[in-house]
């Protein structure tokens, strides 16, 4: 299965192994948000399927990035696809007949985030891996996703990723690395309670995400990734 998938990577974009010296998910290695940013910038520069948008800034002043991944043809009409999603979501200037007709041609908008709780490190890892897979694979299933869907990838807590990954990688002996014992909150003001800020919207990251989801793009599907662990780790 892996050999088959590898053979389908026909798009000429930089691989995680070339960029990091690691595959995403390798043991005893975590990328920082700075490294994620640099990698996404390279993917966006190398592939017409991906555009990077800065949706705001974090509590510590980092650019809060959103990767928009879809087919080149959809990118050429991105504002129209955004308008279609908005009209279908709000339904205040469209009849049922018009909505049903529009739904036949409008693109699905899918939001995928990760890393909200920064010690749940798989969420950030899947954002890097998914971006790479979506811009590099040329199999029929990926092409269908690109044609039918506008995918929005967002790291929900960039400051936390920078802190946790930096703390983890500071230890030169890989066997001694741990995400435990971090000396400060992995979101500057609310720490692990950043998910509960979704109803208060007091933090800049929550403001950025809420604006995109409920004022600009109105995704029909939203994946907010979390992780159980440390034993029997599951991404959900």
Where would I find each of the regions flagged by the language model?
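M14 metallocarboxypeptidase catalytic domain recognition
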Residues: 1-236
């Amino acid at each position: 299965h892996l050999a088959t998938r590898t053979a389908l990577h026909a798009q000429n974009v930089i691989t995680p192994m070339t960029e990091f010296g690691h595959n995403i998910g390798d043991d005893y290695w975590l990328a920082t948000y700075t490294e994620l940013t640099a990698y996404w910038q390279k993917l966006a520069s190398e592939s017409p399927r991906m555009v990077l948008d800065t949706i705001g800034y974090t509590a510590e002043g980092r650019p809060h990035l959103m990767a928009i991944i879809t087919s080149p043809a959809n990118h050429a009409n991105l504002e129209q696809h955004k308008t279609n999603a908005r009209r279908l979501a709000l339904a205040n200037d469209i009849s049922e007949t018009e909505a049903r007709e529009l739904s036949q041609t409008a693109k699905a908008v899918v939001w995928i985030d990760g890393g909200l709780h920064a010690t749940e490190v798989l969420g950030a890892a899947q954002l890097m891996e998914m971006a790479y897979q979506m811009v590099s694979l040329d199999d029929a299933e990926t092409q269908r996703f690109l044609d039918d869907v506008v995918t929005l990838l967002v790291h929900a807590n960039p400051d936390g990723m920078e802190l946790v990954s930096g703390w983890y990688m500071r230890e030169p002996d890989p066997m001694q690395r741990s995400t435990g014992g971090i000396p400060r909150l992995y979101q500057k003001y609310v720490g692990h309670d950043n998910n509960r800020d979704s109803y208060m919207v007091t933090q800049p990251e929550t403001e950025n995400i809420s604006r995109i989801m409920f004022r600009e793009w109105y995704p029909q599907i939203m994946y907010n990734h979390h992780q159980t662990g440390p034993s029997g780790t599951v991404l959900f």
